[in-house]
Amino acid sequence: MLFTIPYSPFPISGSSMRIISFNANGLRSAATKGFFEWFATQQADVLCVQETKAQEHQLAGPAFLPDGYRVWFRDASTKKGYSGVAIYSKREPDEVRTALGWPEFDEEGRYIEARFGNLSVVSFYIPSGSSGELRQGYKFQVMDWLRPILVEWLHSGRDYVLCGDWNIVRSALDIKNWKSNQKNSGCLPAERDWLNGLCADRAEEADAASGRGWVDAYRALHPDGQDYTWWSNRGAARANDVGWRIDYQFVTPTLRERLQGCSIYTAQRFSDHAPFTVDYHT
């Protein structure tokens, strides 16, 4: 009798794989607030960090590297101490990529991808446009340039987990003050249309011709959830839970049925963002 082993895209043995996404708003600052002590207790397989706000040599040493992990960085080369992304992993990737081909975007340290067999885990940091028209214009340029890349990945045959701070909410469920933010970056109709035009939270919403198909892990698991991942440092936004959900894990449709559960950790404040964890069946 021939026995077959069910296919699993995940590069580990065991019943599940845990991936955490976290915008640190400065990894050195987050470390002083206990982030790595918390992370060491989470049994995560992969951690995707955004806004490291440091150069790799400034993040060397045991204070920034929990036992059992390796780390890969993509620093901003045009402006030191700005942006920056990283991936921590228990397993050595087969390949790490740090550029998508547009120098202005790549040199700001906004993308890193770790490849494990047929699985790609990406840490993305999409620009914010909140500082003014110039950066909002750049954000729209990034969105236009990135869309065909995301559509290509969707149909590439690879399994993808896209972690990161996308600086865009998807709907009124994702922001406390929906009406008053309609003209603010991150909640602009054009931004929401772009992001929602890539997503298919239910299988029947997928449309290969238009490029819709990415699954928002949180929304797939919590269709009516109203949890947030970012709060302004102004006033008492965090205390009053006046937040935005702008940190995501988007996955290819092949991983929809692998979604096991997710959580947003708010008991401690390591940053103006909260760590977002997703568990996947392997």
Positions of PLM-derived features:
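Active-site beta-strand/loop signature of hydrolases that rely on acidic residues for catalysis
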Residues: F22-N23, F39-H57, V121, I149-A172, ...
